[in-house]
């Protein structure tokens, strides 16, 4: 009886069944497909189909399929080697959907098969970023921002090149976790050497930017904080910083002009978006006439010149 049973199992994936499975996958009938795949023995499943199914599940965000395929066919049975790009896609979906144990597994899978190849460095960074964000999101109030920042330093700051450019836009959950943190503690983290050293040139500016994005801090404090930080670290990249600050100055022409004088006086590189926020803030305030000092910039942005004329 046992040999007969095995013969029946091996005949499960006949041509008709394979055709149906591929059709369901390509037609995005994932719910029906998942139900059928769960009944197929691992020994009968083909690597090429699992790879296609995993790829399509990630492409169209079918979380139940991703969760099942990843844990059964990748983690438990090690059937397929997932390419770096797909690992990142799965990681972003896992982060979004709260599957917060998966990102660390993705990084381990990547390091096992691709870790020694510098060609895939961008994927390594992306997977580590997702891992850091996953920790920041998953632990919520249970873990302090200081601990979450330590994880960032250990997992990312210490592992990428010194001149790799971090951006606050890539870490929304870590930024959110900073809210409510004691002001004095943040100043200590920003200006004092901690137990874990900071290696990357953009890590501290990113921490500064995270602080500047917090609504709980007043604008005057933010501008002074930037000025004090800049006097210590003059040769770092502040493009994100000045953009955030000028956006914060919306409707406050006085502070906006004060900030611009500091930026120009120190010849700090300023991106076009920051200039646009600056001009908009003074045109919308009682200091609109100061915009005439920057007419070369006003003319570059659609609508600003007309707004200025309407203020006259």
Swiss-Prot record:
Membrane topology: Peripheral membrane protein
Single annotated GO MF: translation initiation factor activity
Biological processes annotated in GO: positive regulation of mitochondrial translation
Targeting signal (transit peptide) range: 1-12
Record has Hydrolase as a keyword: no
Keyword entries, A-Z: Activator, Membrane, Mitochondrion, Mitochondrion inner membrane, Transit peptide, Translation regulation
InterPro entries in alphabetical order: Pet122
Compartment(s) of residence: Mitochondrion inner membrane
Keyword check for Transit peptide: yes
Name used for this protein in its record: Protein PET122, mitochondrial
Organism of derivation: Lachancea kluyveri (strain ATCC 58438 / CBS 3082 / BCRC 21498 / NBRC 1685 / JCM 7257 / NCYC 543 / NRRL Y-12651)
């Amino acid at each position: 009886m046992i040999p007969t049973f095995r013969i029946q199992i091996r005949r499960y994936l006949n041509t008709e069944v394979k055709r149906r499975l591929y059709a369901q996958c390509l037609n995005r009938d994932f719910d029906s497909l998942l139900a059928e795949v769960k009944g197929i023995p691992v020994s009968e499943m083909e690597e090429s189909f699992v790879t296609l199914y995993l790829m399509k599940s990630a492409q169209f965000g079918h979380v139940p399929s991703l969760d099942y395929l990843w844990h059964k066919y990748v983690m438990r049975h090690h059937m397929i080697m997932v390419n770096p790009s797909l690992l990142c896609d799965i990681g972003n979906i896992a982060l979004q959907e709260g599957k917060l144990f998966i990102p660390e597994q993705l990084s381990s899978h990547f390091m096992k098969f691709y870790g020694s190849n510098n060609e895939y460095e961008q994927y390594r960074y992306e997977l580590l970023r997702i891992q850091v964000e996953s920790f920041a999101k998953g632990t919520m109030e249970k873990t302090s921002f200081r601990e979450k920042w330590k994880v960032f330093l250990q997992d990312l700051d210490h592992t990428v090149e010194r001149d790799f450019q971090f951006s606050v836009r890539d870490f929304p959950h870590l930024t959110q976790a900073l809210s409510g943190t004691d002001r004095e503690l943040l100043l200590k983290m920003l200006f004092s050497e901690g137990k874990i050293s900071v290696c990357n040139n953009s890590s501290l500016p990113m921490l500064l930017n995270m602080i500047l994005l917090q609504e709980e801090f007043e604008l005057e404090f933010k501008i002074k904080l930037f000025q004090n930080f800049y006097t210590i670290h003059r040769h770092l990249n502040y493009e994100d910083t000045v953009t955030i600050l000028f956006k914060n100055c919306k409707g406050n022409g006085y502070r906006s002009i004060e900030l611009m004088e500091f930026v120009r006086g120190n010849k700090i590189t300023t991106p076009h978006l920051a200039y646009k926020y600056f001009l908009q803030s003074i045109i919308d305030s009682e200091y609109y006439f100061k915009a005439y000092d920057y007419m070369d910039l006003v003319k570059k942005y659609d609508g600003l010149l007309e707004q200025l004329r309407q203020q006259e």
